[in-house]
Swiss-Prot record:
Its EC number is 4.1.1.98. Binds 1 prenylated FMN per subunit. Transmembrane segments: none annotated. This is 3-octaprenyl-4-hydroxybenzoate carboxy-lyase. It comes from Histophilus somni (strain 2336) (Haemophilus somnus). Homohexamer. Belongs to the UbiD family. It catalyses: a 4-hydroxy-3-(all-trans-polyprenyl)benzoate + H(+) = a 2-(all-trans-polyprenyl)phenol + CO2. Prenylated FMN binds at residues 175-177, 189-191, 194-195.
Amino acid sequence: MKYKNLRDFLELLEKQGELKRITQEIDPYLEMTEIADRTLRAGGPALLFENPKGYEIPVLCNLFGTPKRVALGMGQEDVTALRDVGRLLAFLKEPEQPKSFKDLWSSLPQFKQVLNMPTKVLSKAECQQIVFSDAEVDLYKLPIMHCWKDDVAPLVTWGLTITKGPSKKRQNLGIYRQQLIGKNKLIMRWLSHRGGALDFQEWKEARPNQPFPISVALGADPATILGAVTPVPDTLSEYAFAGLLRGNKTEVVKSISNDLEIPASAEIILEGYIDPTETALEGPYGDHTGYYNEQEYFPVFTVTHLTMRKDPIYHSTYTGRPPDEPAVLGEALNEVFIPILQKQFPEIVDFYLPPEGCSYRLAVVTIKKQYAGHAKRVMMGVWSFLRQFMYTKFVIVCDDDINARDWKDVIWAITTRSDPARDCTIIENTPIDYLDFASPIAGLGSKMGIDATNKWIGETQREWGTPIKKAPNVVKRIDDIWESLNIFAPK
């Protein structure tokens, strides 16, 4: 399925019973969060609040609130098909030279997909049907959600922030939360390693004290939105990846006030700049950890132009203790990561980021172990190969007879195959998510790897235990007579 814009996607969701229109008046202050949270935890539909209290623009929440809807947004029918997306990314990250004509022929589908990567630049777009500039800009007219009662202010959550470094060939798309502090002012909260922050730092070094241009898109098509949260190779733009997912080139249009290209399909666009000398204290906000984060100074985004469709939809979400929408996205994108990791480490059988681990803070890996110390090599690989895992605090490595997605299996492996002193690897002074207040220093903390594999010669001096196995002939015999035993017959 190809979705040219958000509305195409919503039409499909509605046909499949995956979208609920809410006509009753609902307040963006706390009430939408409460409804969205209850709905997501029950595995419910996307929500379109058509009558937000005090506003004329409807609010879309819980769009990617189930793994199925994430898969649909990527043009797949179910989550398992996302591994095909991962295989494509693995191919693009490290393409292999064809060894024969047969290899070249088998690679043609992937190369045909690559042809859809360039963007298609339009001269005009629906996202610029209505234009407010300078003094006309009033962000308070947008139904920006105030998610939790102790949040300091309303928060823009699903904005696709578009930036470009002065020496970069391509633009960067990233999603960073933005605190509303004035009619035309937002605080841009991006961490120093993220693409937008790196572009900004490069700009400040190359053009000191000059305003840094920014555009933010709200309500783009699902492929573009998901392209901004997927681990695309550094050499591939998010727009190009969205084109691969969609099967058609991503349509863009030039911003009104700068040279940045914005998604033509977007519902609402914010354009403006960051003054390198202007910062403001951000937060506190309830975030994906389930706690309120610390306050810190971040750059201020001054909005000079607000453009939109004639009948826009405001796309929003909330973050809180898992499960929340970021956790669901992490669970679905887990399937994308697996082929990328397996291309570098073929011994990996499965890789799992439990949603309750705040999307990325704990990983369970199962491997076909081949030598002593193998588990430790895989730990180091997980932490270093993809930057998405630089903040993963715990990596548990198990053998391939363990189901990485079954905590009972994993706990059994840890308690029977690992010794705390021998099998726990602790690395200090490593990068840690700034939001992780458990670390002793903001942004710097430790990591732990647990080797829960069977030990080989060189790893133990003792005879290793042999797992209990059932007799196959007995299992078959009992299978045949099980129903007749009536052990679980109704009382």
